[in-house]
């Protein structure tokens, strides 16, 4: 049996068009592998989306990632890189992808199709990004899954999409019906780990999203980030927190004074104001921002008079693009088409676009 490090969805890229954000990603990537060395793990498993850009990858970004991985090619552990949707050129084919060259490194394996692999005494099923896990799980051995682990990159119904609380609504066409892709599909496994959604979360005792190792956007504001060390002998997990990468904050204007410079320095902050600021108030706010050393800031204005029922209606519809799709199909004339299938296709398109 073995000690295995799991991480996912690092999306290396100069996010926000800032070189510093690229450096944040590279620093987090080094930290992951340094932890693997320090913890003396037997393997590193990555759950997909190593790079952010799908089709036009910056040469500097790609080279720096390659250099970091190359530094760990002679360590006493093997690294397995699973294919995520951001690693794929085509949305529905694994054939062309950006992680393939990393498989040329010693002790690195890229997994670009469903595969069963024995890793230091434990058996793992790998499931690259898929729109239809029902179909692709059938490509893996069915027997004795209760003793095996799964690492996949996909959408699961009911999972949290972001820190605002939006929830995934995921269905696919299977055997002529629209079927929910829910956590029960993976209940047979000893433990199932997933990449794709960036918020670490447990959907069941044995089903969880690993989450990204650093905050990449305001959609991850307030989320703690970690990597996982799995002891397959004891089937126990240690969560190692990333306490160094910049964070994202939503802060009400009147609460800004309650934060320290240490908390906000080099962070990304969205200050929520109650209305348009006077010249004097704007100057006071700018002084506070400067004194706190905030690296990046944007302002967001609250509506002054919005009734509760309007807010609730907006949350029900606008916060979830799936609701918009369902509403649209209800209102247009599509009697000659299967509405459930049409809605399912729309949701898949929306999910793919939102992942971009």
Please name every model-derived segment:
Residues 11-15, 52-55, 81-93, 117-118, ...:
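Active-site environment of divalent metal-dependent phosphoester hydrolases
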Residues 9, 29, 44, 49, ...:
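Divalent metal-coordination and catalytic microenvironments
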Residues 38, 43, 231-356:
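Accessory, non-catalytic peripheral segments of nucleic-acid enzymes
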Residues 2-4, 43, 122-123, 147-149, ...:
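Structural motif
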Residues 1-25, 143-144, 149-151, 155, ...:
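Mobile, glycine- and charge-enriched loop segments
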Residues 2, 14-116, 185-189:
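Core catalytic region of metal-dependent phosphoesterases/phosphodiesterases
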Residues 156, 162-234:
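Conserved beta-sheet core of the metallophosphoesterase superfamily
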Residues 65, 87-178, 213:
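Conserved catalytic scaffold of divalent metal-dependent phosphoesterases
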């Amino acid at each position: 049996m073995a000690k295995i490090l799991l991480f996912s969805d690092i999306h290396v890229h100069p996010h926000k068009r800032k070189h510093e954000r690229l450096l944040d990603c590279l620093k987090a990537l080094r930290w992951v592998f340094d932890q693997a060395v320090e913890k003396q793990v037997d393997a590193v498993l990555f759950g997909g989306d190593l790079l952010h850009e799908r089709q036009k990858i910056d040469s500097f970004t790609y080279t720096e990632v390659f250099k970091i991985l190359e530094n760990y090619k002679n360590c006493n552990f093997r690294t397995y890189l699973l294919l995520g949707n951001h690693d794929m050129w085509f949305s529905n084919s694994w054939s062309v992808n950006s992680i393939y060259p990393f498989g040329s490194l010693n002790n690195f394996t890229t997994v670009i199709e469903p595969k069963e692999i024995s890793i230091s005494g434990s058996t793992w099923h790998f499931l690259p990004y898929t729109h239809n896990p029902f179909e692709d799980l059938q490509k893996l051995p069915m027997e004795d899954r209760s003793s095996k682990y799964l690492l996949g990159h996909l959408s699961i119904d009911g999972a949290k999409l972001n820190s605002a609380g939006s929830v995934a609504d995921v269905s696919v066409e299977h055997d002529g019906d629209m079927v929910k892709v829910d956590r029960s599909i993976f209940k047979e496994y000893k433990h199932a780990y997933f990449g794709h959604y960036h918020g670490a979360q447990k959907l069941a005792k044995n089903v969880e999203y690993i989450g990204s190792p650093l905050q990449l956007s305001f959609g991850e504001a307030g989320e703690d980030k970690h990597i996982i060390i799995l002891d397959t002998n004891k089937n126990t997990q240690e969560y190692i927190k990333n306490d160094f990468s910049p964070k994202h904050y939503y802060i009400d204007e009147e609460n800004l004074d309650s934060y320290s410079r240490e908390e906000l320095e080099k962070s990304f902050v969205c200050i929520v104001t109650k209305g348009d600021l006077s010249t004097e108030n704007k100057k006071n706010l700018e002084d506070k921002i400067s004194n706190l050393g905030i690296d990046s800031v944007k302002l967001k204005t609250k509506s002054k008079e919005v009734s509760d029922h309007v807010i609730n209606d907006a949350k029900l519809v606008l916060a979830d693009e799936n609701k918009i799709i369902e509403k649209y199909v209800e209102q247009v004339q599509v009697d000659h088409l299967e509405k459930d299938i049409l809605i399912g296709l729309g949701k898949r398109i929306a999910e793919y676009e939102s992942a971009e």
